[in-house]
Amino acid sequence: MITRFAVKNYRGFADKIVWDLSHPSSYSFNTNAIKDGVVKNGIIYGPNGSGKTNLGMAVFDIVNHLTQKFKKADYYKNFIYAGRQDNLVDFEYTFKLGEQEVRYDYSKARDGKLINEKLVVDDNVVFDHQGKNLVIDTKSFPMEPTFKEGLAQNANHVSIVNVLLTSYPLVEGHYLMKLKNFVDGMLWFRNLDIREFIGLETNVYVLDEYIIKKGLVDDFQSFLAKVSGQKFTFVKPEKNDKVLLCDYNGEKIPFDIIASTGTHSLMLLYFWIQKMDKATLVFIDEFDAFYHFELAFEVCKRLFALECQVFTSSHNTYLMTNDLLRPDCNFILKNNEIKSLCDCTEKELRWGNNIEKMYRGKAFEV
C-alpha cells in the first residue's frame, strides 16, 4: 500500500505538498476503509483549480519510468511549475509492502528525464544516486567498478531500480519485486471530454467488443440495473459481433446510440472493475462528473469494497457522509495542502455528525 506521497515543483504545486495516509484516526465505524493501519479508501474535495487532477497524476508519475504499462502521451507537457522551469520536480513515495517500508525518492527534469534517485528499505539505504554520484549497497548487489561507474554516469537516464531488476536474479518476495508488482498494478483514469488512463494495462480496448468477447453481456446488464436502476435488454450476441445491441420492442438498437453520457461513464467503470482484481492502487479523477448524486454513492460503495486502495476526486459533497466513509478518509485540497477532515478542525468528529453540513458551513480549515 502507499502510505505517503509528496511532490514539489510539479504543475501547479510550486511548494512541497504532502499526502499522508499512514495515521488514520481511531474511529470504530467504517473500519473497512482502513487496512493494516493505512487509509485504504478516500475522496478528495477542493475548489476548482486547487489541484485534484494534478495530485492524482503526480502520484502516478512513477508508472512512466518503472513500468511498460500504458502512459498518457502528453503527460510531460506542462509537467513542471511554470515559474521554475530550470528546477527539478521532486517526488517522494513511501510504501508498505508486506512487513517492509520502502521509501523511493527521485527528481526529474522538465522533459521527464530522471536525474536523481534514492531507494531506502527499512531505514537502510539501497542506493542513492544524485547527479553523477552514486552510493549503493554492493553487499546486496555486488558489481564491477566499471558497472558501478556506468550506473553513476547514467547517460540514458534509466532508473537504477529497473537496472537492478533486470541485472540480478531476485526471488519473488524481494522488495524490488514487490515494488515492481505494486507499481505495475497502479491505475489512474478519468472520463470527461475524452477517456484517459495511466497504468495497469498495456492495450487499449473497444468496450463493446471487450464485453462481448469476455461473455459479460448479461453481467453488464445486471450491473447497470443494480447500480443505476436502468433496465436494458441486450440482444444475445452472435459469433464475431462487436457491437452491443438492445432489444426495444423487437428492434435492435446499438447501445452506444441510446446510452446517456452517464451510462457511457458507467460502462467504462464496469470495464475497469473487471481489471481491478490485479490492481493495487486506483485513482479515479472526477469519477462522478456525469452521475446523479445517489448513483455516485452506489458506485463508491462498490469501489470501496474492492481489495485494492481506491481514491477518487469529486465536487459532490453528498458523498461526504459517515454512512460511506469516515472523517479521516475525506480529504480537502486547498492552497497547496491536503488534509483529512479530522485534521481540519479542533472539534471531535463522531459518527452522528453531519460532516457535509459542517463542510458547507466552513467548519473545516486547511
Where are these regions (language model features)?
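Post-Walker A helix-loop "phosphate-sensing" segment adjacent to the P-loop in P-loop NTPases
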Residues: D61-A73, D277-K278, A305-E307
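Short basic/glycine-enriched coil/helix segment immediately N-terminal to the Walker B
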Residues: W272-T280
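Pre-Walker A-like glycine/lysine-rich segment at the N-terminus of P-loop NTPase domains
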Residues: M1-F60
